Amino acid sequence: MQTVSTEFDTIAAISTPPGEGGISIIRISGVDALKTASQIYRGKDLNKVNSHTINYGHIIDPENGNEVDEVMVSVMRAPHTYTKEDIVEINCHGGIVATNRILQIILGLDARLAKPGEFTERAFLNGRIDLSQAEAVMDLIRAKTDQSMKVALDQLDGNLSHLITNLRQNILDVLAQVEVNIDYPEYDDVETMTARLLKEKAIEVKAKIQQLLSTAKQGKVLRDGLATAIIGHPNVGKSSILNHLLHEDKAIVTDVAGTTRDVIEEYVNVQGVPLKLVDTAGIHETEDKVEKIGVDRSRKALSQADLVILVLDSSVPLRDEDRELLRETNHMQRIVVLNKSDLEVKINLNELQEYVDDKEIIKSSAVSPLGTKDLEDRIAAMFFAGSIENTSNNIMVTNARHIGLLKQADTALDAVLEGIETGMPVDLVQIDMTRTWDLLGEITGDSYQDELLDQLFSQFCLGK
């Protein structure tokens, strides 16, 4: 990671969401940030105020001297800022007109409009954070539960960075020792000694990488949410289950079969587990072209689901479509909900037990929250019981890019161990150890391609 600041041009952007609100914030960063802000600010001389202070004044249109807005202006001087550059943040009244007017005045002076994520990109390029920490900023913004926020904060604080840096240093130390042993052999069995040194370090690093990878499944759930498909025959109460989990009415509920003809997606926090709930159209044979499209989309949602909530109508006997869905989801993470339990039970429970264990079954009612708490408890119990089960000293891997690089590093270490076992020359085995070092460096951004930065930071919003 770079540690020396690079001088860039001055950038500006609105950092708050568009629309009406109490305040809006326009952020300026760069060598001319103070100069630019001073040209449009009436109040204390910003060039003379202390760093990390907030100052009351007004924004003035420099072309005509007219007052634009009453503002509070924060001044933060390099290097102790988010970007390690001078930063000025203008807090104006919320709303589109005033905010955009101030931004346009700034862009007419010594600043240009920032690209998405450019402030965070500068924080990385100027050495304040590494690449994994930069990615954690986006994870923090997108966090859907307290636990996903905690994991993102831990990564932003550098927990993952420190572990990866230590692993790379351990590898570098052993590579240096290998080079010394090869170039200046003091003993006849130097090849054997060096191979043993490489093997011990490869086993040690591999164990720590596998510890990290063991958290990947839970990490993906926390970061991206658990893709949860609510499926079943038309009019079994799928939309009611969705609404009960959301604790509000999002889906249309009627007694008409086929009311849901499309896929409805909503996020909900279930005891710390972020669910991406997908309420699907009823899966059944149909000649209706529009309804058939909905059924096809339902099957696609089912194929992509991490968890399936299969809803059955307990007030009618099992249908052939029910049996098909029970068979189809048998090897998936599944909860079976017997809905309409407030009505007379006509489903054959003995037959149902041929397809599903009792522990998978939850009884519920479409007209009341009956069974909702049981369903939430079951979901939480299936996925780490609402707490972060962690085997890597509170470090969890959540990012698909990091997971992929760790898997590649693990494979490279397999090659190291295989090479040693087969008697491959140490200088050749060393190549795979060096590759492991490089791959781990890609996680923190010690080595990267410009295209990767463009791809990562383009996912950020303007002003961050």
From Swiss-Prot:
Binds 1 potassium ion per subunit. Gene3D superfamilies: P-loop containing nucleotide triphosphate hydrolases (3.40.50.300), Probable tRNA modification gtpase trme, domain 1 (3.30.1360.120), tRNA modification GTPase MnmE domain 2 (1.20.120.430). CDD domains: trmE (cd04164), TrmE_N (cd14858). InterPro entries: G_TrmE (IPR031168), GTP-bd (IPR006073), GTP-bd_TrmE_N (IPR018948), GTPase_MnmE (IPR004520), MnmE_dom2 (IPR027368), MnmE_helical (IPR025867), P-loop_NTPase (IPR027417), Small_GTP-bd (IPR005225). Its cofactor is K(+). Residues 225-384 form the TrmE-type G domain. Mg(2+) binds at S239, T260. GO terms for cellular component: cytosol. This is tRNA modification GTPase MnmE. It comes from Pediococcus pentosaceus (strain ATCC 25745 / CCUG 21536 / LMG 10740 / 183-1w).
